[in-house]
Swiss-Prot record:
Modified residues (Phosphoserine): 345, 597, 617, 727
Gene name for this UniProt entry: FAM13A
Organism: Homo sapiens
Site keyed Arginine finger: positions: 81
Start-end of Polar residues biased regions: 536-549, 738-748
Coiled-coil parts of chain: 666-730, 946-978
Stated name of the protein: Protein FAM13A
UniProt domain Rho-GAP: residue ranges: 43-231
Length: 1023
């Protein structure tokens, strides 16, 4: 050992490093997860695709959010309008970017996930509708007709970059699902366009931006309304061949022989697999693909299954080796307690199944090693076909990008009318395979199947182009090295049908019809639980295909060859396919019963619900007009749609307008307050920009504010009507009280009829308001006659007025016990005289108990007579005193000995005369801080030291000044009334603010002078 090596061994740092390495090696692989931060928000879509952070061309974060919202949020009321918690949204964002596995159901909620989706779109460096094309979108909607708009809009959408196009299509597809549930979530197309318009179009701030945003929202609504036309119009004549080939494709679910080779598809396994290096993009025009008519789509390896051609001589040996290999490794790889980790069939195209539990990294490594060894041993795999081992592993990734059959079945109803009409006539009999002459002609090429799925799925457009160029070389290798294979023919794939959405492939596996052919070439065996179906558009030509089967066999070419199921085993050993999940494997289950997927929990709960009828099959919406599907009792997952217990439309799922009528007063009040707040914000914003308050015409010019104003008036009217109904309802106790939050349809129809009958009976018994008033007045007249009380209040004494008050009070209580307080305008007008008389009597009694000190005219103001306040009418509390009508006689007779104390004897007539003089009230000037002339009077500070003659002289001067100012103010208010047709309000007094303030100070000084004179008079008498 050299000196250097000895020094390293003796170094403590080296020993410590060695110990640390031992610890790292000793830690299991599944505990060594290091989540690295990777920015997802605020990154361009092209960059996300380059980094491999997309699924089928859609950003992974968007994919996860939309999948979660599709399952849990479609019926959430106020979806996308109700914002999520800011902290929760930020935590979800950090988790996504740090690489931590995110479960939106546990870590967040529906509102937070919706807010996170809007945040992702909002933070894109270039908006979803790119800034380069946005002016053209806006210009298109500013001029042009409807038909021109639609065709031009379709062309503009095609000009979007691939990543933007795919995301826009995926987003619009999801939003159309949300709009279909607008009865529950209150989000129709226009509401969704209002929410997502600002997120898909980035407009500049300011007034111009607001106008531009309104147009962008209309564009978004147009895109959502015409989603099928704008995005699926690419299904043109160039796609006919592809449609027919895909329609004839046989997709086989899991077909397990008693034992099978386990192939685990978990998301954890997909993450650990090496990704193929990025490939350079070869520019190519969108129409170039249609010229290359004879190029074969060669797929990459899928699910670790190599490209192979099964020969008859290898079939039995393969099955025996697979049975023996499974016995050694199935116990390690597939736990019996986890049914979700069951192996998947190589023919099962959709690996987008719900996420299952991840096996440890060590188990994954072991599984991959064993699988590759078994494949090489069983299938004699070589990599000379242009696929490396990394490509083989990356095929698992491609399998995960497909949608599950269950999801395709659930989404099929969205493609009903468009696809049903479009697929008519897409028939090419030459491409219809009827069978195979020899077993050697049957190729089970899973890579071809998966590649067709991936190209039809189409959103990962850039990465699929170089693979298509490579496929021509592989085709030549197939012809050179493998004899007896079925010829291949490619699709005339244009750029337009590379970019088809995830829903364009839905009908491949779940919308087929079982066929039975007795031709001499091949027999297709089918069981009651597995039917291999054709596309419905091909059923009309089934007999013609049988007749031309001989010609087709010679010239038959297909993009994806059919698998002859007889090539897998002998006819005598043919068995039923074993379902992929153990929960489906029930020995006692009827073979004719449709199997439900593990995700059918919500369907089962709804079917087993006590008050609910069985739900319709999802296929009913897509093919509701086709009798061949209505009468097919074998169609999973539900019974036939023509059965008598078809679910009827519940009244609780009525239109939004019907539910509007059922709003409670509290809900109406909340909506009114919300609308008033929105209008107030608009007014404030308008005032900041224009420097003046918006008029009614300004509000009407804005469509949104005009809608708010109309809704506000409508809700106010409904609130008034609901209050009227409540006031007219009988207050008798009811047998059953229902919550206001439940729709009225939950109540029994019989109960509603009983309530209506009871209301009619009550209305028939209850007298009218006029009849009640007449009876009350008749009783009051009788009581007055019994007690010899005069009818005129002026002629009554104090005791008689007190008795009159009690009688009026009892009469009004009797009226309110029958009809309640007067609410409507008619009731108020009828009952106004009686209420006014009662109010006047009360005021006289309260006034009589307050004896003023001095008989000065100012004593009238110490307890002014308040006028009746009528509901719904504008009350004016600021009217002038008619003191000048007394003339100058009262003022000229003012002498030092004018003090006259009021007699203790009560006279109702003198009080009423005084009330008539005070009927117009008094002016209450605006509380302004403008300095008054009187405040600068130097004699004001010396009033306390002045003599009585000086005080009286000053009092006379102040009265003259008060009359002068009052006359000036009266002229101003009369002119204002003639010009505007209403009384002067406080905010209208600005031009005369100084006069009002001066008038206020003069009144205060007059009160002070009267108090001083009264005080001096009492002092002189006491002396």
């Amino acid at each position: 050992m050299g000196a250097g090596a000895l020094a390293i061994c003796q170094s403590k740092a080296a020993v410590r490093l060695k110990e640390d390495m031992k610890k790292i090696v000793a830690v299991p692989l599944n505990e060594q997860k290091d989540f690295t931060y990777q920015k997802l928000f605020g990154v361009s879509l092209q960059e996300l695709e380059r980094q491999g952070l997309t699924e089928n061309g859609i950003p992974a974060v968007v994919w996860n959010i939309v999948e979660y919202l599709t399952q849990h949020g479609l019926t959430q009321e106020g979806l996308f309008r109700v914002n999520g918690n800011v902290k929760v949204v930020e935590q979800l964002r950090l988790k996504f970017e740090s690489g931590v596995p995110v479960e939106l159901g546990k870590d967040g909620d529906v509102c937070s996930a919706a807010s996170l989706l809007k945040l992702f779109l909002r933070e894109l460096p270039d908006s979803l509708i790119t800034s380069a094309l946005q002016p053209r979108f806006i210009q298109l909607f500013q001029d042009g007709r409807n038909d021109v708009q639609e065709s031009s809009l379709r062309d503009l959408i095609k000009e979007l970059p691939d990543t933007h196009y795919c995301l826009l299509k995926y987003l619009c597809q999801f939003l159309t699902k949300v709009a279909k549930h607008h009865v529950q979530n209150r989000m129709n197309v226009h509401n969704l366009a209002t929410v997502f318009g600002p997120n898909c179009f980035h407009v500049p701030p300011g007034l111009e931006g607001m106008k531009e945003q309104d147009l962008c929202n209309k564009i978004m609504a147009k895109i959502l309304e015409n989603y099928n036309t704008l995005f699926e119009v690419e299904y043109t004549e160039n796609d006919h061949l592809r449609c027919e080939n895909l329609a004839r494709l046989i997709i086989v679910k899991e077909v397990y022989y008693k034992n099978s080779l386990p192939i685990l598809l978990t998301r954890g396994l997909e993450r650990d697999m090496p990704k193929p290096p990025p490939k350079t993009k070869i520019p190519k025009s969108r129409s170039e693909g249609s010229i290359q008519a004879h190029r074969v789509l060669q797929p990459e390896l899928s699910d670790g299954i190599p490209q192979l051609s099964l020969r008859l001589s290898y079939r039995k040996a393969c099955l025996e080796d697979m049975n023996s290999a499974e016995g050694a490794i199935s116990a390690k790889l597939v736990p019996s307690s986890q049914e979700d980790e069951r192996p998947l069939s190589p023919f099962y195209l959709s690996a987008h199944v719900p996420q299952v539990s991840n096996v440890s990294a060590t188990g994954e490594l072991l599984e991959r090693t064993i699988r590759s060894a078994v494949e090489q041993h069983l299938f004699d795999v070589n990599n000379s076909g242009g696929q490396s081992s990394e490509d083989s592993e990356s095929g698992t990734l491609s399998a995960s990008s497909a949608t599950s059959a269950r999801q395709r079945r659930r989404q099929s109803k969205e493609q009903d009318e468009v696809r049903h009409g479009r697929d008519k006539g897409l028939i090419n009999k030459e491409n219809t395979p009827s069978g195979f002459n020899h077993l050697d002609d049957c190729i089970l090429n899973t890579q071809e199947v998966e590649k067709v799925h991936k190209n039809t799925f189409g959103c990962a457009g850039e990465r699929s182009k170089p693979k298509r160029q490579k496929s021509s070389t592989k085709l030549s290798e197939l012809h050179d090295n493998q004899d007896g294979l079925v010829n291949m023919e490619s699709l005339n794939s244009t750029r337009s049908h590379e970019r088809t959405g995830p829903d364009d492939f839905e009908w491949m596996s779940d919308e087929r019809k079982g066929n039975e052919k007795d031709g001499g070439h091949t027999q297709h065996f089918e069981s009651p639980t597995m039917k291999i179906q054709e596309h419905p558009s091909l059923s009309d030509t089934k007999q013609q295909r049988n007749q031309d089967a001989g010609d087709q066999e010679e010239s038959f070419v297909s993009e994806v060859p059919q698998s002859d199921l007889t090539a897998l085993c002998d006819e005598k050993n043919w068995e039923e396919p074993i379902p992929a999940f153990s929960s489906w494997q029930r020995e006692n289950s009827d073979s004719d019963e449709a199997h439900l997927s593990p995700q059918a929990g919500r369907l089962i709960r709804q079917l087993l619900d006590e008050d609910s009828d069985p739900m319709l099959s999802p296929r009913f919406y897509a093919y509701g007009q086709s009798r061949q599907y209505l009468d097919d009792t074998e169609v999973p997952p539900s019974p036939p749609n023509s059965h008598s217990f078809m679910r009827r439309r519940s009244s609780s799922l009525g239109s939004y307008d019907d539910e509007q009528e059922d709003l409670t007063p509290a809900q109406l009040t909340r909506r009114i307050q919300s609308l008033k707040k929105k209008i107030r914000k608009f007014e404030d914003r308008f005032e900041e920009e224009k420097k003046y308050r918006p008029s009614h015409s300004d509000k009407a010019a804005n469509p949104e504010v005009l809608k708010w104003t109309n809704d506000l008036a409508k809700f106010r009217r409904q609130l008034k009507e609901s209050k009227l109904k409540i006031s007219e309802e009988d207050l008798t106790p009811r047998m059953r009280q229902r919550s206001n939050t439940l729709p009225k349809s939950f109540g029994s129809q019989l109960e509603k009829e009983d309530e209506k009958k009871q209301e009619l009976v009550d209305k028939a018994i209850k007298p009218s308001v006029e009849a009640t008033l007449e009876s009350i007045q008749r009783k009051l007249q009788e009581k007055r006659a019994e007690s010899s009380r005069p009818e005129d209040i002026k002629d009554m004494t104090k005791d008689q007025i007190a008795n009159e008050k009690v009688a009026l009070q009892k009469a009004l209580l009797y009226y309110e016990s029958i009809h309640g307080r007067p609410v409507t305008k008619n009731e108020r007008q009828v009952m106004k005289p009686l209420y006014d008389r009662y109010r006047l009597v009360k005021q006289i009694l309260s006034r009589a108990n307050t004896i003023p000190i001095i008989g000065s005219p100012s004593s009238k103001r110490r307890s002014p007579l308040l006028q009746p306040i009528i509901e719904g009418e504008t009350a004016s509390f600021f009217k002038e005193i008619k003191e000048e009508e007394e003339g100058s006689e009262d003022d000229s007779n003012v002498k030092p000995d004018f003090m006259v104390t009021l007699k203790t004897d009560f006279s109702a007539r003198c009080f009423l005369d005084q009330f008539e003089d005070d009927a117009d009230g008094f002016i209450s000037p605006m509380d302004d801080k403008i300095p008054s002339k009187c405040s600068q009077d130097t004699g004001l500070s010396n009033l306390h030291a002045a003599s009585i003659p000086e005080l009286l002289e000053h009092l006379q001067e102040m009265r003259e000044e008060k009359k002068r100012i009052r006359k000036k103010l009266r002229d101003f208010e009369d002119n204002f009334f003639r010009q505007n047709g209403r009384n002067v309000q406080k905010e209208d007094r600005t031009p005369m603010a100084e006069e009002y303030s001066e008038y206020k100070h003069i009144k205060a000084k007059l009160r002070l002078l009267e108090v001083l004179i009264s005080k001096r008079d009492t002092d002189s008498k006491s002396m």
